[in-house]
A protein has these predicted regions:
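C-terminal regulatory/interaction module of P-loop NTP-utilizing enzymes
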Residues: 1-175
């Protein structure tokens, strides 16, 4: 098995190299010459869509979109990765992050940011989200200044109020 993670972050020379590998199951290494696989490996390629991957390379791949987890799946991930965060805090922050993903952002927060945010909030002894805490830790979730500027302040407070109202009315089992 061969994992090529974040292909879109490589240069075109690497894509050409990979194209040779996927076309003929062989590679050319200047110091060693041409090497051919005895058995074609299973190749998994990931991309974060930071740039377009060459069409010739995409034609040799099966495409599978992996969407963000739903609320319960992301909560389960946090239960494993941030066990010190309280159940109510985890429910609030997962719901908040999922609302952020629905906004028109340059880069929506991924699961890694959800985990990082939970761990940061634990370090800050946070037991429940409030607008000030959300604003002061927004940089853990959003990685572009335009996104932060768009969400911080009244928009973050509005999203948080929605989260809190939904969690109260839905009686989501968070434990």
């Amino acid at each position: 098995m061969l994992l090529i993670d974040e292909l879109d972050r490589t240069d075109e020379a690497f894509e050409a190299y990979l194209l040779e590998l996927l076309s003929d199951w062989q590679i050319t290494i200047p110091e060693l010459g041409q090497m051919t696989a005895e058995e074609p490996p299973v190749v998994i390629i990931t991309s974060n869509r930071t740039r377009e991957v060459h069409d010739a390379l995409k034609r040799r791949c099966f495409y599978h979109w992996v969407d963000y987890p739903d609320f319960q799946q992301e909560l389960d991930i946090l239960n494993r990765k941030a066990p010190d965060a309280g159940a109510d805090l985890k429910a609030q922050l997962v719901s908040f992050v999922q609302k952020l993903r629905q906004q028109n952002l340059f880069k929506a927060p991924g699961v890694a940011e959800t985990i990082d945010w939970a761990q940061a909030l634990v370090e800050l002894n946070c037991v429940a989200l409030d607008p000030q805490m959300v604003d002061s830790t927004m940089g853990v979730l959003l990685k572009y200044q335009d996104d932060i500027a768009r969400i911080q302040g009244s928009e973050a407070a509005r999203l948080l109020a929605e989260v809190q109202a939904e969690l109260v009315t839905s009686s989501i089992a968070v434990r």
